[in-house]
């Protein structure tokens, strides 16, 4: 009994069949078929999607033939939606420049050179601007040497081909520009040289003195006595009129010695003509007085009324006057 119960509790295992490996191969075939079925299902789904897309039609026209109105757009863009960028994000903050007071102070404290220092620096130069050296070959000043006439052909090596002209002429000069420069120097020295200036002043003073001496004898004989008295008391025998005019010229700041001789002659001749006219006027006044006295005398004494002249006229006038007084 006990064994039967144990048999019921513990049943013997069933023997395994040899068809088990065949069952293992089945799932492989089943898997392939399932994969193929999946591919076929995906292809069918794509065909269904294509059919769905082909069924969608886009209609842009209405049934009545009019096109729908386009959607309204705002005239102005919404500026509020535009993100604003701040300057602080764009530009990095730069540090403030530091003032360099020391450099500015040193630049301000630099003093300009004084006149004494400038003159001392200028006095160190040994160049004489008035020098005109003598050419040893010709014995003439260097600015008066004529290259074509004074120098022989052998003394012109700069004319040879291949010669560097800067070995004979400095500062960019050549034979032609040096001739022009020398001529210009001679002209300037002739006009503004110290010797020429002194000679011109001397000649001007001589002309001035000759003009003064010739002008003293010009006035007429009527005023010769007064002029001689004026010359004796005047300056260097100068007439009073000339002396007064010279004083006026010097008082106004003019130097008579620096004036043009022709201008001085014109001034003195005008003054002398004015003096001669005054003398003639004085003589005419004397003649008028003499004629008037003669006429009065003739009128008083009752001289011949037929006498011609200024005196007779005066007499006739007097006689007529007496008659008119009688008639009144």
Swiss-Prot record:
Composition skew (Gly residues), residue ranges: 301-321
Keywords associated with the record: mRNA processing, Nucleus
Amino acid composition bias (Low complexity), ranges on this chain: 111-126
Region of interest: Disordered: 1-159, 301-328
Example of a GO cellular component annotation carried by this entry: mRNA cleavage and polyadenylation specificity factor complex
Chief place of localization: nucleus
Location relative to the cell: Nucleus
Biased composition (Basic and acidic residues): 13-30
Pfam families in alphabetical order: Fip1 (PF05182)
Alphabetical GO biological process terms: mRNA processing
InterPro entries, sorted: Fip1_dom (IPR007854), Pre-mRNA_3'-end_processing_reg (IPR051187)
Ranges of compositional bias, category Acidic residues: 1-11, 31-58
Family affiliation: Belongs to the FIP1 family.
Annotated function: Pre-mRNA polyadenylation factor that directly interacts with poly(A) polymerase.
Name of the protein described by the UniProt record: Pre-mRNA polyadenylation factor FIP1
Organism: Gibberella zeae (strain ATCC MYA-4620 / CBS 123657 / FGSC 9075 / NRRL 31084 / PH-1)
